[in-house]
Amino acid sequence: MKKILTSVFAFILAISLTACSTVNKNAEKKELKKVDFVLDWAINTNHTGLYVAKEKGYFAEEGIDLDIKPAPEDSTSDLIINNKAPFGIYYQDSMANKLSKGAGITAVAAIIEHNTSGIISLKKNNIKEPKDLQGKKYGTWNDPVELAMVKSLFQKQGGDANKLNLAPNTDTNSVTPLENGLFDAAWIYYAWDGKLAESMKLDINYFYLKDFNKDLDYYSPVIIANNDYLKENKEEAKKVLKAIKKGYVYAIEHPEEAAEILIKNAPELKDKKDFVVESQKYLSKQYATNKDHWGEFDANRWNAFYRWVNENKITKQPLADNTGFSNDYIK
């Protein structure tokens, strides 16, 4: 009888402990703070660290439930400026005009340490440097800062701005219209469109903007946050960025595994696995020279670009040094 009672007691205790464990786990889940994060474009390897951090539970460790939102039809920055979401992905160059108009946003982490963007063309067009764009069709997004940079590099080498022909570039990637002859050259980010061109076995030429003007080694892309949110939720913002940093550090250390996680969260990339892995291998080396300092801004480089913007009178109001970025939330 004693053995029976002991067994019954043990059974009841086990059930109670299981129930308590379930309640505790549910309580833990309920305690997670939901935070929205808006992407800038279709899911790509710029975003890998976010999905790694979510998959690996890094956000949950910080008490955060990050809800990654797809890119809007309009600018991601407008959603952040208007406090529709606290975080998003944007670019230092595109921030210039927003900041000059008093937009309440701050870049809080650099996804990639150096500017990997540049001009791609088919090798047959013989475009190896900015001056070679003369007489060619350049596919443009028609962004004022973009055009100012291209024209500046072109003219610096003696090019005639009147002989730079512009064509609209509205495709989701620049490689397909380039291959089809809609334009002769386009501005791309090498990790995605450059690697896409390689996967398509296209013979291309490519040059980095920063190689022709060091002031154009700006930060792109960056994580931006709403200023009011940062003031009211400083510790929460730090937790979000701590988890994101862990995600990108993992991607630096394990590019192939990180690519698998990205593909898992973006099934549309499944049939492009080899391309995605190659893109990730390239980008994992670009995220940061020193993984311990991922996300941190170099004030000199940030300011050098906005001084260039000021000198070229691209914005209505000049941008003061140290405008628009902070390392306070990533360190």
Outline where the language-model segments fall.
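Short, surface-exposed acidic
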Residues: 161-165, 268-279, 315-323
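Conserved C-terminal helix/tail region of periplasmic/extracytoplasmic solute-binding proteins
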Residues: 302-331
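Short polybasic/polar patches that bind polyanions
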Residues: 54-55, 60, 99, 155, ...
